C-alpha cells in the first residue's frame, strides 16, 4: 500500500537545510506519515527533542506506529518525541519561544489523505465529498458544494483554485445538485470546463484544490505559522517550507522575503528548490514541490 512505501518529498534537501544537529530541538509542523520526522529523529540522538503536529487523527495514529517502530530500532538513540494532535497554527501556544533549532513545514496533502477514497480528497477513486483533514471538525466539501450560492462558489473556486472558468463551473454545480461524491463532482466540472489541449492536469483539479483549501482553511493556517516562526526559532535556527501550489508558495516567498528585509532572516534559497528527475519518476507528486529555507539572525 502507498502508506507502506511512503517517501517524503524533497527529504534530503529538507534535512540539509534544517541543518539537523545532534541534541537539538526541531519541530515538524506537518507530521503526516512521519517520513520527515523519522529522518530528523535518526539524527537527533537521545539528547534531542522532536515536536510534531498533525490535525488528522488517522494520520496521527499511523505516524505513532511508525515512530514506535523507529524507537524499537534506535533504542537508546531515540530522541524525545512530543506529538500534538492539533493544527500547526497553534504552535505558538505549545512551543517555548526561542527554543527551536529548526522548523519544517510540508504543506502538501499526505498520500494517506489522497489515496483513501473515504476521505474524499481525490477524484481518482469515488468517495464521499468530505475533504476535511480532521474529519471531526468543520464543514465538509459536500456541504459547501450543496449549500453555498452560485456566486459564492464561483468566487471560492477562482480564489483558491485559480480557476478562470469558475463561474461556468459554479453554475454547473448548482444545476447538478445534490452533488455527494468525488466522482460526481469531477464529472460535473469536466463537462462544464473540459480539459484544454495546453493543460496536463485533470479539468477538476483546480476545483478540488479550491474546496480542500477552503474546507481546511489552509492558507490562514500557513500564514499563522509563518508569522509566529521567528518567535519560536532561536538565533541560527532554520525554517524550511515545502509548498505544492502557487498560493502556498506565494505566502512562503513573501514571508521569507519580508523577514529578510526586516533583518529577521537570512534567506538561504534565492530561488526555490525543486525535485530532480529521479525523485519525480519515483514520486510524481513531487513535481510541483518547492522548498524555501531561511536562517534566523
Curated annotation (Swiss-Prot):
- Which Gene Ontology BP annotations are present? rRNA base methylation
Instruction: Quote the EC number.
Output: 2.1.1.199
**Main localization category:** cytoplasm
Q: Name one GO cellular component term.
A: cytoplasm
Is Transferase there in the keyword field?
yes
- Any Pfam family hit: Methyltransf_5
The kind of enzyme this is, by top-level EC class, is transferase
Residues annotated as binding S-adenosyl-L-methionine: 34-36, 54, 88, 106, 113
Q: Which reaction does it catalyse?
A: cytidine(1402) in 16S rRNA + S-adenosyl-L-methionine = N(4)-methylcytidine(1402) in 16S rRNA + S-adenosyl-L-homocysteine + H(+)
Keywords, alphabetical = Cytoplasm, Methyltransferase, rRNA processing, S-adenosyl-L-methionine, Transferase
Q: Which InterPro entries match?
A: RsmH, SAM-dep_MeTrfase_MraW_recog, SAM-dependent_MTases_sf
Q: What Gene Ontology molecular-function terms does this entry list? A: rRNA (cytosine-N4-)-methyltransferase activity
Q: Which residues form a coiled coil?
A: none
Q: Does the keyword Translocase apply?
A: no
Q: Which NCBIfam families match?
A: 16S rRNA (cytosine(1402)-N(4))-methyltransferase RsmH (TIGR00006)
The family database entries (HAMAP family) matched by this protein are listed as: 16SrRNA_methyltr_H
Protein family (similarity comment): Belongs to the methyltransferase superfamily. RsmH family.
Q: What does this protein do?
A: Specifically methylates the N4 position of cytidine in position 1402 (C1402) of 16S rRNA.
Q: What is this protein called?
A: Ribosomal RNA small subunit methyltransferase H
Annotated source species: Acidobacterium capsulatum (strain ATCC 51196 / DSM 11244 / BCRC 80197 / JCM 7670 / NBRC 15755 / NCIMB 13165 / 161)
Amino acid at each position: 500500500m502507498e502508506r507502506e512505501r511512503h517517501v517524503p518529498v524533497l527529504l534530503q534537501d529538507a534535512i540539509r537545510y534544517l541543518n539537523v544537529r545532534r541534541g537539538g530541538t526541531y519541530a515538524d509542523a506537518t507530521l503526516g506519515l512521519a517520513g520527515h520526522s523519522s529522518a530528523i529523529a535518526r539524527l537527533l540522538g537521545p539528547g534531542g527533542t522532536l515536536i510534531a503536529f498533525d490535525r488528522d487523527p488517522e494520520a496521527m495514529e499511523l505516524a505513532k506506529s511508525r515512530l514506535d517502530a523507529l524507537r524499537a530500532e534506535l533504542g537508546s538513540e531515540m530522541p524525545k518525541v512530543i506529538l500534538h494532535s492539533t493544527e500547526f497554527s497553534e504552535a505558538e501556544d505549545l512551543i517555548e519561544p526561542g527554543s527551536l533549532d529548526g522548523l519544517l513545514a510540508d504543506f502538501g496533502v499526505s498520500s494517506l489523505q489522497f489515496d483513501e477514497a473515504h476521505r474524499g480528497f481525490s477524484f481518482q477513486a469515488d468517495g464521499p465529498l468530505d475533504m476535511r483533514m480532521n474529519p471531526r471538525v468543520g464543514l465538509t466539501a459536500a456541504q459547501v458544494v450543496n449549500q453555498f450560492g452560485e456566486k459564492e462558489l464561483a468566487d471560492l473556486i477562482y480564489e483558491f483554485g485559480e480557476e478562470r472558468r469558475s463561474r461556468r463551473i459554479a453554475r454547473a454545480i448548482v444545476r447538478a445538485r445534490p452533488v455527494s461524491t468525488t466522482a460526481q463532482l469531477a464529472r460535473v466540472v469536466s463537462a462544464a470546463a473540459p480539459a484544454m489541449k495546453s493543460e496536463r492536469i485533470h479539468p477538476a483539479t483546480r476545483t478540488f484544490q479550491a474546496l480542500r483549501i477552503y474546507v481546511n482553511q489552509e492558507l490562514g493556517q500557513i500564514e499563522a505559522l509563518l508569522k509566529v516562526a521567528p518567535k519560536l526559532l532561536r538565533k541560527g535556527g532554520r525554517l524550511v517550507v515545502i509548498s505544492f501550489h502557487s498560493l502556498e508558495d506565494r505566502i512562503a516567498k513573501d514571508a521569507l522575503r519580508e523577514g529578510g528585509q526586516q533583518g529577521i532572516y537570512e534567506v538561504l534559497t534565492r530561488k526555490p528548490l525543486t525535485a530532480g528527475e529521479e525523485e519525480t519518476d519515483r514520486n510524481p507528486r513531487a513535481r510541483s514541490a518547492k522548498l524555501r529555507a531561511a536562517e534566523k539572525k
